[in-house]
Amino acid sequence: MAAGEGRRMRPLSERWPKPVLPIDGRPVIASLLRELVAGGFSEVTVVTGHLAEQVEELLGDGSAFGIAVRYARQPKPDGSADAVARALEVGVRPPLIVSAADTLYSAGDVGRFADAFAASGKPSALAYVPDGRPAPLWGLTEAVTAVLHELAGPPFELLEAVRRAGEVARVEIGKTRGVTGPLDLVRENFPYLR
């Protein structure tokens, strides 16, 4: 899903969509595609919306990333369920993995999750890493590679799990350099952005 407006990233996201902003020198969506390829995936459908043309121009047909990319448009930000519905409209069929395009995963996580899901025989699965904060009601505590099972408890347990699913990734930060003078952060860190 690459359709969101990225309101918390303003003012950067007013000019560039979050998935094309770099982390560790590459667009975050490129890191996601790399993980999908490493996990054995051969195609991906990217749901675009806000500044869609930039995402589509960056990814093209996906050949530069080793994965076939097709697109679905979400004309207005109507949430994740609508984004999945848009993907289904262009021919996506289960089983499928739904992920925000600006999520970083540790190496191998996507493939391990897909393998665990396939072996589970369950109709669906949700992966997340608990953040240590107490959940307001019930919370799941399985790691990404845990045995999958149905959610127990009231429906709002799913809401808590979905909230935490956005916190799946750990970011590894490499070497940084000292800054002793004025610096155009956009030009220095995002050279491929216009």
Question: Predicted segment positions?
Answer:
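Conserved N-terminal catalytic core of the sugar/cofactor nucleotidyltransferase
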Residues: 8, 22, 26-110
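Catalytic-core segments of class I nucleotidyltransferases/pyrophosphorylases
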Residues: 97, 104, 111, 118, ...
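A generic "binding-loop/recognition-motif" signal
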Residues: 5, 16, 51, 175
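Short beta-strand/turn micro-motifs composed of small residues
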Residues: 2, 48, 100, 128-129
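Conserved beta-strand segments of alpha/beta enzyme cores
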Residues: 19, 68-70, 167-169
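Conserved donor NDP-sugar-binding/catalytic core segment of glycosyltransferases
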Residues: 117-124
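A phosphate-binding catalytic loop at a beta-strand-loop-alpha-helix junction
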Residues: 1-12
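Conserved beta-strand termini and adjacent loop/short-helix elements that scaffold enzyme active sites
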Residues: 49, 72-74, 127-129, 171-173
